[in-house]
Amino acid sequence: LLFGKSRIGAVMEQHYQNLIDETAEYLEGSELTRKRLNEDDRSMRIQSDYIWQYSRYPVHENTTAEYFQVGDDMFPVLVHELEQAKHFIFIEYFIINDGVMWQTILNILEKKAKEGVDVRLIYDGFGCLTTLPYKYDQEMRRRGIKCEVFNRFRPILNIIQNNRDHRKICVIDGWTGFTGGINLADEYINQRKRFGHWKDTAVMLKGEGVWNMTAMFLYMWGIVTRTDTSLDFGNYVPHRWHPNDFPGSGYVQPFCDSPLDDEIVGENVYLNIINRARNYVYICTPYLIIDNEMMTALCLAAKSGVDVRIMTPGIPDKKMVFLLTQSY
């Protein structure tokens, strides 16, 4: 049995809260945007306000979004955008594995670092435990890339080992951002066949909404380096390097959840979406392990006439998880 809260967790939580307090002004968002959202869709304003209050990330306008239904479509666009970088590149991923995808990206990162671009990389210590060499972060630094490992894996019994960084974020110059389910490994772009044709999705944002993703990275950078990154925030806002207006209609609100508080923002957002659905709920997920509250919401939506469909892989990458998924 493990009792109490780890001291490491307490220190991390306090440091994170200090960063939040010191940078609150950068995440106030636009009251005019919130007012327009309220006029366009009161229900969405309520959802947006919840996200803002409990994840601290505001809603934005002036942002375009492009959806990629497989990694094969996303990868060439990512490469193109990386090659255009002039000021900074922030990359944060759970899994990085050597191969066509990573070597292509790494070559660009090295080139950009030599050009004076601020290139930073965060990868998860457990996610990359068997895919990257030991002390790979030191190799990255030798190549001019600022690199940190999130929660480096240590073979000891410690509850903190369960805290993992599953994010997939790439931010370029503050106004171009990629996220989704695609890690930096060849199977995600179907250059390597592991479990049939690999389907994971991604989204590219361009515009003011990318600021939320930049802030997420800077907060994490402050945590893994145990430094004060609050002074960095003003240097990376979207309009610092892009003085012109951004195109785009509608609203975007990238956000993240945190293990350092008791508010399950991610699940609550999904529950709100499902409970407010009127026509359909379509879910595509590699793993389906849900609690009673989520199951009740999905079943109630279906019983109320909403078209509820869930698609999961037919070829599993984790057999135990696959069995649990089938049980639902």
Question: What are the language-model segments listed below?
Answer:
Residues 1-268, 272, 276, 300-303, ...:
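N-terminal localization/anchoring segments of enzymes in phospholipid and broader phosphate metabolism
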